[in-house]
Amino acid sequence: MARQDYVFTSESVSEGHPDKLCDQISDAVLDALLAEDPAARVACEAFATTGTVVIGGEIGLSDKKKLGEYMGRIAEIARNTIRDIGYEQEKFHWNTCHVHNYLHEQSAHISQGVDRDGAGDQGIMFGYAVDETPELMPAPIQYAHAILRRLAEARKSGAEPTLGPDAKSQLSLRYENGKPVEITSLVLSHQHKDESQTSDDIRAIVEPYIREVLPAEWLTERTEWWVNPTGTFVIGGPDGDAGLTGRKIIVDTYGGAAPHGGGAFSGKDPTKVDRSAAYAARYLAKNVVAAGLAKRCVIQLSYAIGVAKPLSIYADTFGTSEVPEAEIERAVSRAMDLTPRGIREHLALCRPIYRRTAAYGHFGRAPDADGGFSWERTDLVEAIKREL
């Protein structure tokens, strides 16, 4: 039996965090290519530091003649992404930073296996769901995201003009009988523009927004608040710390509450099972919990490069289900085609829906009308039940 009484901590980072900025650039490039060619193959990495962005990786297009045309748009895509995030600092400005593009054509040896509908690489992928929030996500990561998303809204609307784009949050939640009941500590480090602002000044700005998104009963007189605990946080973003695509994989997923296969998501087209199979695993786990078959569920999938069918499917419900895990494994494998092509088609992944995933979590988001976050739907519930 899993522990019922404990304190668990998760962190999130804002869209202006250097690593998240790079994730968004990588996914903006991916979206631009998928918008023109749904069969585009993309593996795009970005690196950002003071005044500079470097983009590299591999792309493959159905019409190779258009490769040069797309290459000419990369710098503009990167600048627009940086502008949207809000970087207009002296040493990192969307309009003046140097953008170096080293993207090149994808290896034919990689593409040949994928062209036969096999997986784009070997690997293991995990999906997770738990009934402690309406989104069926772990509460610490879900609310750590919510804090930063709300503060970004306030900054971008002009309501809080002294806040900068770079920020991090961290929540420690105390659980009783397996349910979150109290925030024991709350950490927020938020970039600001005025060097004269103190930690107390920043807390006065951010606290109303934090209280707006958190359940009121979780904040008690015992909750420790740590807002900009080091003091001044004016130098931020890539000018303060270099950023790199794919370095926030725990922030992107479940905040450490579930295993991670190690593969990052951003910049990868959906033939890459690092991304698409992780989305499918979340979809399956969420539908198992939504079906009432378990209060908590993790699903693992594994693949080999060039091989279509998953090598293994594993489920664990942590003692919260009356249905044997082996039966759940069989049911989910029958309810959905888990080949890479089957996943792409079932979740309609070959479209420009990825930049929005690159900040504030890939999971626990509301499905969009245009097909974004399709893996958050609970439309597989009846199919899974029929297979049991």
Swiss-Prot record:
Cofactor: Mg(2+); K(+)
Region (Flexible loop): 106-116
PROSITE patterns noted in UniProt: ADOMET_SYNTHASE_1, ADOMET_SYNTHASE_2
Example GO BP: one-carbon metabolic process
Binding-site residues, ATP: 17, 166-168, 241, 247-248, 264, 268
Keywords: ATP-binding, Cytoplasm, Magnesium, Metal-binding, Nucleotide-binding, One-carbon metabolism, Potassium, Transferase
Amino-acid positions noted as binding Mg(2+) in the UniProt annotation, renumbered to this chain: 19
GO molecular function, one term: ATP binding
Cofactor binding, per record: Binds 2 divalent ions per subunit. Binds 1 potassium ion per subunit.
Reaction catalysis annotation: L-methionine + ATP + H2O = S-adenosyl-L-methionine + phosphate + diphosphate
EC class name: transferase
Pathway the protein takes part in: Amino-acid biosynthesis; S-adenosyl-L-methionine biosynthesis; S-adenosyl-L-methionine from L-methionine: step 1/1
Chain sites annotated for binding L-methionine: 58, 106, 241, 272
Main subcellular location: cytoplasm
Residues that hold K(+) according to the record: 45
Protein location: Cytoplasm
GO cellular component: cytoplasm
Pfam families: S-AdoMet_synt_C, S-AdoMet_synt_M, S-AdoMet_synt_N
Subunit structure: Homotetramer; dimer of dimers.
Function per UniProt: Catalyzes the formation of S-adenosylmethionine (AdoMet) from methionine and ATP. The overall synthetic reaction is composed of two sequential steps, AdoMet formation and the subsequent tripolyphosphate hydrolysis which occurs prior to release of AdoMet from the enzyme.
Name the record gives this protein: S-adenosylmethionine synthase
Lineage: Bacteria, Pseudomonadati, Pseudomonadota, Alphaproteobacteria, Rhodobacterales
Gene: metK
